[in-house]
Amino acid sequence: MRHIILTLLLGSYTLAFAQNKIKGEWYLYELFGKKTSMEMYRLERQTKEKRGYKINFIENKIFIASYFSSSKDDCSPSTRGVYEKINRHYVSFHVDSFSVSGIGCQMNYEGIHADLGKFYIHFPSKGVLYLIKSTGDLDYDKQLAQDAEQINDINSIAKYVFKRNGENISYNPSFKEEVATYVAQVLKLPHYRVCLKFSVGRYTGDVALVKDLETGTYFYVVKDNAAQQEATQKENKYFHFTSEELKK
């Protein structure tokens, strides 16, 4: 009986400790919860950016995500919802509403009521948190979290994509399937994994992280706007780059 009580107390302590690590304000490159298809969020306790997005996990299991800027004239979109720690590995999210406010902006409020499902919690280092959309397999979620650590400089990725593509905010429900076709036909990788789909800002659209399972090399795959405009409707044009290319 004493062993059972100790086990329950330890479980409660572990759950409370993990939840306390999440609480507070974090910065990220995407408005949390607006895109219900997001598979990965990278959050940081601190930022040097003058504008972007942040999320605050409040004591009473409420989260508020919003846009921040040094300019008072910017419109500020925000989402609001609830979060709940399931266990030490997972947290679930439900988005209740989306709104826009700001000087000179058309006020907008929209009830969303979207269940985002559960996300795997990964703390690779102090002040950094990855939220990985769960696949239902803990071991595989852990592997995806390790893959996600490659995405450690989202700002550089955003600049690279924007320089090549300009604005690209179209939604594509077949994105990962088209990426898989591109990897097989263009990169010609015999063994690979399309790890995660993520966003690097409101203007640059979706990016896929792909791993070559034979060499361990990671590729970023993005839709090619310029090539797509010249292609037929049945063609889907993409381009790719590696982390090494970001350093050039």
What positions do the PLM features span?
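Bacterial Sec-dependent N-terminal signal peptides
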Residues: M1-I22
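Short, non-transmembrane alpha-helical segments in secretory-pathway proteins
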Residues: I154-C195
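Lipid interaction determinants
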Residues: Q19-S78, Y90-G166, E214, E245-K248
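Exposed beta-strand-loop-beta-strand "reactive/processing" segments of non-cytosolic proteins
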Residues: L189-Q228
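A short, surface-exposed interaction/processing loop segment used at functional sites
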Residues: F219-K248
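Short stretches within intrinsically disordered, low-complexity N-terminal or propeptide regions
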Residues: A18, D147-Q150, Y160, Y182, ...
